[in-house]
Amino acid sequence: MKYDDTDILIDTSLLRKIEEKKHRLDSLRPLPKDAIKKLLEDFRLRHTYHSDAIEGNTLTLQETKFVLEQGMTIGGKPLKDHIEARNDAEAFDFMLQLVQKKMPFSQECIQQIHDIVTKGLLKDSGKYRTGNVRITGASITPPSYTKVISLMDDYIHTIKNPPRHPLKKATFIHHQLVLIHPFFDGNGRVARLVTNLFFMQQGYPPIVLKQQDRKTYYRVLHQADNGNLSPLAVFIAKAMNESLQLYLSVFIDEEHLISLKELAQRSPYSQEYLSLRARQGKLDAAKLEQTWYSSMRALKEYVKKMKLS
């Protein structure tokens, strides 16, 4: 299995933002355990909701929270949706255990993640597929089931090689697992968890790929299927930039996230203007559900760049 990240291009300004944030976060280590625990609880909820919603789960974020915290069912919602939410949250916890125990990547780990994700939903949970499949809407057909084990051997071997750049390696990890499609079902959910497993093993926070970006997500996966991994790499990099920003907002006052409405009141710019610049990627910002947030530090950096331009 060939892996060459020289063809994977990510905007240098975006990479610089991520590297600077990662450096600032690393300079704060060791991070307070209580704060990390709360952060990971939030990521666990949001990852579970969004990863399931991408696959068609009908639970809202608040309903997902209720199911996970109270263990009860939501009237009018399919039982399958409740099982998916509980399974994904449990798989996220298992992923954290693998990170804490410093377990190396292996086929067994990936199969265990799949077993948890599809528990009670798939009779072959945790087992590679024993037949050929087609993916609706995909431009390519997954390889023959007879090649899955050898392809997964190559996949694990490539992951274990030192990454030239974690973001580019994560792009390969995510796409290749979707491409091999080793299981009859649940491949997307497993790929998103395995990507986060890799990131956290490299000292990065987990990322959340959002359901409102579902069309973009499938489009960049389609482009990756056709040999262009750069759009997927940028998509993942933007998610990482946001995750790092969320982490820093907890530990540094100047990085504390506030809504653009509040930020506009502290600046000469309108909320509409700041929102536009956030969408354009000019103002470092994070979108949590339907609301944009940024920080005083990001605003100061934006103003500084504007003066220099």
Language-model regions, residue ranges each:
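FIC/Doc superfamily catalytic core
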Residues: 1-185, 189-309
